[in-house]
């Protein structure tokens, strides 16, 4: 285990060779080489939070092509989401997080969530921070 914390059921570990079951695979790097690829399964949510430029890739084509891809910014993703760009996924098969959350739930499918950053979310966070500062005086 890499990290111990206040959550006894949360175990952070390096990827093991061979087959291993993970609930969540989370990548947050600026790697230019693929860090994780496996057969996509509905048991594991893969979330790519790095790779925000076309030349950066964390998650490989096995996951991207084998998963329902959901992005936080459907306008920015086609020019920023290196994992999806390099895998050659058809953009008509990539959905937005907003549509995914408000739509009808699908049967169990593998999901790859890709975040490239979203200025609207950043602006909302700034608004909350500013309101807190004003309240504190």
PLM segments and residue spans:
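Rossmann-like adenosine-cofactor binding region
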Residues: 7-84
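Adenosine-phosphate binding glycine-rich loop
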Residues: 54-137
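Phosphate/pyrophosphate-binding betaalpha-module
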Residues: 1-6
């Amino acid at each position: 285990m890499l990290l111990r914390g206040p959550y006894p059921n949360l175990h952070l570990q390096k990827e093991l060779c061979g087959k291993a079951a993970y609930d969540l695979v989370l990548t947050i790097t600026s790697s230019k080489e693929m860090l994780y690829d496996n057969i996509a399964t509905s048991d594991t949510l893969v979330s790519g939070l790095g790779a925000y430029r076309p030349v950066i890739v964390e998650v490989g084509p096995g996951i991207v092509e084998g998963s329902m891809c959901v992005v936080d910014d459907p306008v920015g993703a086609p020019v920023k989401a290196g994992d999806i760009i390099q895998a050659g996924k058809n953009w008509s098969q990539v959905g937005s997080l907003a549509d995914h959350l408000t739509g009808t739930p699908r049967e169990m499918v593998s999901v790859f969530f890709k975040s490239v950053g979203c200025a609207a979310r950043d602006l909302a966070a700034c608004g909350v921070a500013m309101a807190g500062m004003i309240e504190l005086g």
